[in-house]
């Protein structure tokens, strides 16, 4: 045991004596450390950029939800196209943004959510169905019978700038907003009551 202690003390003494030595090659040290520093910088950049993209997608969904909650007129295809364009403005660097706007209600006797109307813009996104809505019921708020709310869903694809072990993926956000100024929000192709879905 005493011998092991002496070896450890001798090693520590050599280490402390060597810490004041300044002999070395800066080029060799740079060659050894530069790849690690570049990898750390690239990884930090990618993860920061991913959080930024997620934040922008979430803010866009909340903004669209807020716009819809204040609307008291008919929602028309032109209005939805404008909201899709707004999403594009809010997410300028986004790749293939997609959006789905739905109005739904809660039916207490059947303990289920029902879609009143739904419309979507973007590739690969279709209108929401009752079955699909009830699949995400864990993300929906508790509501009284026949309460109406809007559901805005946004998707955007994200591909990392550098390969740091993070595969390309899609950000998806769901935002539920209660209507503020009207009891219901109707969708109409013509903008009139004749074909309104409420």
Regions found by a protein language model. Name each.
Residues 2, 62, 66-198:
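Short, conserved structural patches
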Residues 1-89:
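Alpha-helical assembly-interface signal, strongest on the long, hydrophobic N-terminal helix that forms
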């Amino acid at each position: 045991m005493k011998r092991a202690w002496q070896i450890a003390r001798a090693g520590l003494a050599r280490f402390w004596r060597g810490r004041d030595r300044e002999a070395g090659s800066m080029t060799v040290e740079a060659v050894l450390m530069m790849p690690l520093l570049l990898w750390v910088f690239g990884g930090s950049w990618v993860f920061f950029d991913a959080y930024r993209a997620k934040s922008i997608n979430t803010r866009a969904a909340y903004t669209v939800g807020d716009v819809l909650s204040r609307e008291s007129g008919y929602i028309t295809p032109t209005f939805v196209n404008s909201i899709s364009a707004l999403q594009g403005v809010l997410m300028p660097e986004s790749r293939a943004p997609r959006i789905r706007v739905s109005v739904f209600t809660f039916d207490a006797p059947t303990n289920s959510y029902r879609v009143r109307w739904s419309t979507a813009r973007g590739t690969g996104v279709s209108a929401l169905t009752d079955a699909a809505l009830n699949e995400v019921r864990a993300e929906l708020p508790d509501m009284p019978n026949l309460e109406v709310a809007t559901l805005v869903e946004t998707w955007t694809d994200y591909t990392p700038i550098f390969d740091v072990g993070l595969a390309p993926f899609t950000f998806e956000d769901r935002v539920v907003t209660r209507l503020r100024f009207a009891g219901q929000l109707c969708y109409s192709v013509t903008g009139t009551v004749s074909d309104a879905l409420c």
